[in-house]
Amino acid sequence: MDGIKYAVFTEKSLRLLGKNQYTFNVESGFTKTEIKHWVELFFGVKVVAVNSHRLPGKGRRMGPILGHTMHYRRMIITLQPGYSIPLLDREKN
């Protein structure tokens, strides 16, 4: 699916891995329900909650022209106890 861009590994997201919460950057047009359904289907896990916030784009200057990068949405997905996403668990250790 093209909706999820990549997993995020910041200090906060690594701390949230201990609480069984995973952080992803997704396309800004997707809703919480769509991402929840896709994560449950693709990873075979049970999602308890989905929190999201929209990150602003950054300004970029190329000579006299001022441009910007696109904004995106970050989703924090909480899984039911006993479930995990195996590819991201290696980052916990």
From Swiss-Prot:
Main location (coarse class): plastid
Molecular-function GO terms, alphabetical: rRNA binding; structural constituent of ribosome
InterPro entries per UniProt: Nucleotide-bd_a/b_plait_sf (IPR012677), Ribosomal_uL23-like (IPR013025), Ribosomal_uL23/eL15/eS24_sf (IPR012678), Ribosomal_uL23_CS (IPR001014)
GO biological process assignments: translation
Entry's localization field: Plastid, Chloroplast
Keywords (A to Z) from UniProt: Chloroplast, Plastid, Ribonucleoprotein, Ribosomal protein, RNA-binding, rRNA-binding
GO cellular component: chloroplast; cytosolic large ribosomal subunit; plastid
Pfam families: Ribosomal_L23
Keyword rRNA-binding: yes
Subunit structure: Part of the 50S ribosomal subunit.
Family recorded in the similarity comment: Belongs to the universal ribosomal protein uL23 family.
Role, per record: Binds to 23S rRNA.
Record-linked HAMAP family: Ribosomal_uL23_B
Name this polypeptide is given: Large ribosomal subunit protein uL23cz/uL23cy
Source organism of the structure: Oryza sativa subsp. japonica
Organismal lineage: Eukaryota, Viridiplantae, Streptophyta, Embryophyta, Tracheophyta
